A protein has these predicted regions:
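Polytopic transmembrane helical bundles with strong interfacial aromatic enrichment
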Residues: 22-333
Length: 333
């Protein structure tokens, strides 16, 4: 039986073949500071799109401009009053982000030697185009809850892709992985991080349906408990066994901190929207800003889980076993 680590890290000399040597070269590229900072700018504007969209929904401004892509059948800027300010602002930020995404795709092809990185940049471009199309469908079909929720999910997916591009273009991530720790535990850390991302996506879908009037709040609140358990489990695993790896410890601490903040914001949002929401207009500003903060923190929480999953894949390969005929003892490669 031969045991060997499998993951995003570079294979060891004992198991490296010519094909794996080619894989090693495909995982590295010269660091380009302009590329990295451009990716950071794109991720920042992707986050602004989420905040602007949350403001549109919270202020019930989704139909303030009833046509798309024009505004009141013209491309001229409308009078920025009432809900038009939120909806038109959201569209302008989203449009600029699309331009940034076109640029990041072109720059990535030009300067990044990693084929998978080029594919990721184009996936990001395709994702934001899908988000724009869903935005049009949402407006033209009078805000159907399922489409509005899909629009929000795709938007946060693009934000996570933009964050991943920004992460993987940083100086320390353009070269080979230097330090790894083989994971022998069940479930593996990679499995836990992927589970964390999954339950957060479920929570995003449930929250979107509740927020857009497609379902009641019970499922969203119940799944919040599931999210808290899974993310705490994942963070504790990292902090207990991999605290010496900054690449894992930092996103784990960030994820745990954001989780606590998100639970608090979720409770405040529940009070303002569900408990106090029918008592009068004086609660509306608090309802709007607590909900927007809840959405924004949720996006950061999902991005932190994605970053942790990437880092686990890079730094903590899973120990797998392969049966070799005629052998009786384990050989560690």
């Amino acid at each position: 039986m031969i045991r060997y680590p499998v993951g995003f890290g570079v294979p060891g000399p004992a198991c490296e073949s010519g094909k794996e040597s080619l894989l090693r070269s495909s995982l590295t590229t010269p660091y380009n500071s302009a590329h990295h900072y451009y990716a950071l700018l794109t991720a920042f504007f992707a986050f602004l799109v989420i905040i602007a969209g949350a403001l549109v929904t919270s202020n019930e401004a989704g139909l303030a401009i009833p046509d798309w892509p024009t505004s009141f059948h013209t491309f001229r800027m409308p009078h920025m009053v009432g809900g038009v300010l939120y909806e038109y602002g959201h569209r302008m930020i989203a449009g600029f982000t699309i331009l940034l995404t076109v640029g990041i795709a072109v720059v990535t092809v030009a300067v990044d030697k990693r084929r998978w990185m080029r594919k990721l940049a184009f996936i990001g471009f395709a994702t934001i185009l899908i988000q724009a199309i869903l935005g049009r469908v949402t407006v033209m079909n009078l805000l159907p809850p399922a489409v509005s929720t899909a629009h929000a999910i795709v938007g946060q997916t693009f934000f996570c892709i933009a964050v991943a591009i920004a992460l993987l273009t940083a100086c320390r991530y353009t070269g080979e992985v230097q330090k790894t720790a083989v994971d022998r535990r069940k479930p593996s850390l990679i499995a836990l991080t992927l589970l964390s991302v999954l339950v957060l996506y479920v929570q995003l879908a449930l929250g979107g349906m509740f927020r857009h009037g497609g379902m009641s709040w019970e499922a969203h609140v119940f799944n919040a408990i599931v999210v808290a358990i899974v993310l705490t489990w994942t963070s504790v695993r990292v902090l207990s066994y991999y605290s010496d790896l900054d690449a894992l410890r930092r996103p784990a601490i960030m994820m745990l901190s954001l989780l606590m903040a998100q639970l608090c914001l979720g409770f405040i949002s529940f009070l303002t929207k569900v408990v106090w929401g029918q008592k009068g207009a004086q609660t509306q500003p608090m309802m709007v800003w607590s909900t927007v903060a809840h959405v924004a923190t949720g996006a950061l929480l999902l991005a932190s889980a994605v970053v942790l999953a990437i880092q686990a894949w890079r730094h903590v390969p899973v120990l797998q076993e392969e049966r070799v005929p005629g052998t009786r003892k384990a050989v560690t490669a």
